[in-house]
Amino acid sequence: MKPTEEKSAPKAHATRSSESGRQGFILDLWGVRYQVEDVSRSVAFYTKQLGFKLDHQKLPAFAQVSIGNLKLILSGPGASGSRPMLDGRRQEPGGWNRVVLQVADLPARIEALKKAGLRFRNEMEVGPGGRQIQIEDPDGNPIELFEPAR
């Protein structure tokens, strides 16, 4: 590259224009962040119980695990992604928004996970889109297991 040439910025994925004509600024989905109390415990849960792969970790504050195209960012106390909000509210584990993971043979998965001692939020639900059930990670963060209708 010549000294007068500038390196071009990465190109964003094509996005729909807003009404004002500007392009979107979102480049891509990075991942989903869950607040956790114990990063090591959460890594063990996601890798051993659900088959995630450990990408990297900086204990005790942070780890990233993945499965397929999903990156799950686990932020423990002290991580930059866990700091209090401007109004003082603490980011805490739990809630109702959740990661939805597709599975095959949901009843068999439920049976195996119950034998492993996982916590369930509900019984299996069946609807027009498929079957689902919610489990919790060790910090109470919800995870939905979903089997699409055939």
List PLM regions with ranges:
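Mature N-terminal segment immediately following signal peptide/propeptide cleavage
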Residues: 34
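Short glycine-/small-residue motifs
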Residues: 142-145
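Vicinal oxygen chelate
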Residues: 2-30, 53-102, 110-136, 147-150
